[in-house]
Regions:
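Structured mid-to-C-terminal alpha-helical surface segments
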Residues: 1-44, 54-60, 64-66, 70-271
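Glycine-rich beta-strand-to-loop/alpha-helix junction loops that act as flexible
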Residues: 46-50
């Protein structure tokens, strides 16, 4: 385990709270544990906002959850629990980070989530000292998962390790689908960043989005209508939902306007 001073130094340079860096550090060790657990590495595919930070864009917004799609033949929750218990033991032996599983939930869809509470370099348990782990088994994966190296900046994680991850296109298509399911400002931010900053072309991801939406029972042709209906809610929660994940939050109105041209391009493409 690294010293508190290393956490505080990184936090100071990045202009974020030391507890945010500690959580990112613990997430890195959990990922290292997955890479060293044969069952988890073979059956879990890393996805969501955290994969953008830990695999594709090291300076990206921080994310506090770990999201995976299970790709094994049998979604055996007891086997998943057993594998995570082994991971917890391994991480403690290697780093002295204490982890424990809390608040397990199995949903009607069969999906499984729990929280990993932790004691890291900054010491004892406190508010928000946990990481939500969500494992879904009802997702359609459009593109083949890719084995990717995890990005790390911590002194005790210099060894390179990799796990299976969503392709960038898969992340985009699922983010578009997620907007139809929930109202999370991070989805809007992520899509804006990927289209506007990284130059991704929405037309390249339309077919994957359509398949993913239909798979969950949504009409992909209603995407823009759904987005427009949620504008006020996105705007209301824009700053408070993103404040813990980045130091400079772009203006919502600018983001909304710039995303508009991508939605228009999407609409023209599907006509």
């Amino acid at each position: 385990m690294i010293q508190p001073g290393e956490i505080q130094s990184i936090a100071g340079k990045g202009g974020v709270r030391d507890t945010q860096i500690e959580k990112d550090y613990v997430i890195s060790w959990v990922m290292y544990g997955i890479a060293n657990n044969l069952f988890l590495k073979e059956n879990l595919v890393f996805k969501g906002g955290t994969v953008l930070k830990k695999v594709y864009f090291p300076d990206y917004r921080f994310s506090e959850d770990l999201d995976f799609t299970f790709t094994g033949k049998d979604f055996d929750i007891e086997a998943i629990k057993a594998a995570f218990n082994k991971l917890i033991e391994w991480v403690y032996e290697e780093s002295r980070i204490s982890l424990s599983v809390q608040n397990e939930t199995q949903h009607d869809t069969g999906n499984y989530n729990f929280y990993l509470s932790y004691t890291g370099p900054l010491g004892g348990a406190g508010a928000n000292k946990d990481i939500k782990v969500d494992i879904s088994q009802d997702e359609l994966i459009y593109n083949a998962p890719e084995e990717k190296k995890i990005i790390n900046t911590y002194s005790d994680l210099e060894e390179k390790y990799s796990i299976f991850c969503y392709s960038l296109g898969e992340v985009i298509a699922e983010k578009m689908r997620s907007i139809m399911q929930r109202t999370a400002p991070r989805d809007i931010y992520d899509l804006w960043y990927l289209f506007e900053v990284e130059g991704q072309d929405i037309e390249d991801h339309v077919f994957a989005f359509q398949d993913k939406a239909k798979h969950k029972g949504y009409d992909p042709n209603k995407l823009i209508k759904v987005i427009e209906q949620k504008e006020k809610t996105f705007a209301k929660h824009w700053k408070d939902h993103l404040a813990n994940q980045m130091t400079e939050i772009p203006d919502f109105n600018d983001v909304w306007r710039e995303l508009g041209k991508h939605w228009r391009k999407f609409h023209k493409f599907i006509e």
